[in-house]
Amino acid sequence: MTSGSLQFTVLRAVNPATDAQRESMLREPGFGKYHTDHMVSIDYAEGRGWHNARVIPYGPIELDPSAIVLHYAQEVFEGLKAYRWADGSIVSFRADANAARLRSSARRLAIPELPDAVFIESLRQLIAVDKAWVPGAGGEEALYLRPFIFATEPGLGVRPATQYRYLLIASPAGAYFKGGIAPVSVWVSTEYVRACPGGTGAAKFGGNYAASLLAQAEAAENGCDQVVWLDAVERRYIEEMGGMNIFFVLGSGGSARLVTPELSGSLLPGITRDSLLQLAIDAGFAVEERRIDIDEWQKKAAAGEITEVFACGTAAVITPVARVRHGASEFRIADGQPGEVTMALRDTLTGIQRGTFADTHGWMARLG
């Protein structure tokens, strides 16, 4: 199969998982616990561009110990899901937006951009050989797709590499919340920041996530599930929650208003975030993208003005927030249960992804 100037070759796994093995894994897939039988690999070399597009058996890769990615972290990645609909078709949600964001991240890390058409074709190629790994319709299970690009050129000089590799791997993913949506408690980090103006916060870059691990551990030590990030300059303004964007609901019912931090260059432009903003507008809610500081959050939560808070991202879709710890203080969001607006938006978004709600924005695309 060709995509632009690239032709994909397929080398099938000699010993793929048996039907019984795969079905056992799909019953309790977890997240990132199992992987499909194959992966996509595409090479890049300066002067030649992207080439050698292949579907190959999933397995270890060979990398020179001095590969630039191992020393200077020159890599970017994406995350999206493939869903099986009731008619048997396999679809993706806004994969074109993931392709565009991967290019944007690559530009920020001085990595060659992978053309959108090649990105989309890589998804189709992997689904074609591993379609049996996509969980059945009707539940919240899906096949998680992880595309990433990393510098493979050996060398210890601090400079952009001239050789790269694109890989696409896939992992069946179970429902994020078992037994119902579980609100989380969050720890507001005042010592650490996720990103700063002019930095890499808007890129989906592994270094951002590595730098968040210490603060996440601090949150756990303080009895919280997730960390909330403040801005790097004033340490006042809410930016993100863990690796997710965050929303505040003011008021209730049809007059509810949604507020989310504006994209300042230090926030990841989440695809779920963008989708929820559109769905909120469709539902008749007022939406604002603006700065909101920790004092406003605490005061308006205490006054009952902020009635719901949730974070959003590919893995969990929407995660409600029940309790907030900030230094020595602690406060709750309303009654600590998932709110009406939160659940309505979640139901609409997951309904579109599952094919049970109308896709009025043309977000779903067939992969197989």
Curated annotation (Swiss-Prot):
UniProt binding sites for pyridoxal 5'-phosphate: 101, 209, 271-272, 314
Gene Ontology terms: biological process: branched-chain amino acid biosynthetic process; branched-chain amino acid metabolic process; isoleucine biosynthetic process; L-leucine biosynthetic process; L-methionine salvage; L-valine biosynthetic process; protein-pyridoxal-5-phosphate linkage via peptidyl-N6-pyridoxal phosphate-L-lysine
Cofactor needs: pyridoxal 5'-phosphate
Enzyme class: transferase
InterPro entries: Aminotrans_IV, Aminotrans_IV_CS, Aminotransferase-like, B_amino_transII, BCAT-like_C, BCAT-like_N, BCAT_family
Catalytic activity, as annotated: L-leucine + 2-oxoglutarate = 4-methyl-2-oxopentanoate + L-glutamate; L-isoleucine + 2-oxoglutarate = (S)-3-methyl-2-oxopentanoate + L-glutamate; L-valine + 2-oxoglutarate = 3-methyl-2-oxobutanoate + L-glutamate
Keywords assigned by UniProt, alphabetized: Amino-acid biosynthesis, Aminotransferase, Branched-chain amino acid biosynthesis, Pyridoxal phosphate, Transferase
GO molecular function, one term: L-valine-2-oxoglutarate transaminase activity
Control of this protein's activity: Inhibited by ammonium sulfate at millimolar concentrations and by O-benzylhydroxylamine (Obe).
Pathway where this protein functions: Amino-acid biosynthesis; L-isoleucine biosynthesis; L-isoleucine from 2-oxobutanoate: step 4/4; Amino-acid biosynthesis; L-leucine biosynthesis; L-leucine from 3-methyl-2-oxobutanoate: step 4/4; Amino-acid biosynthesis; L-valine biosynthesis; L-valine from pyruvate: step 4/4
EC number: 2.6.1.42
Residues that bear N6-(pyridoxal phosphate)lysine: 204
Quaternary organization: Homodimer.
Family membership noted in the UniProt record: Belongs to the class-IV pyridoxal-phosphate-dependent aminotransferase family.
PANTHER family tied to this protein: BRANCHED-CHAIN-AMINO-ACID AMINOTRANSFERASE (PTHR11825:SF44), SUBGROUP IIII AMINOTRANSFERASE (PTHR11825)
Stated role: Catalyzes the reversible transfers of an amino group from glutamate to the alpha-ketoacid of the respective amino acid in the final step in the biosynthesis of branchedchain amino acids. The amino acids can be ranked in the following order with respect to their efficiency as amino donor: Leu > Ile > Val.
The protein's name: Branched-chain-amino-acid aminotransferase
Species for this entry: Mycobacterium tuberculosis (strain ATCC 25618 / H37Rv)
Organism lineage string: Bacteria, Bacillati, Actinomycetota, Actinomycetes, Mycobacteriales
Gene: ilvE
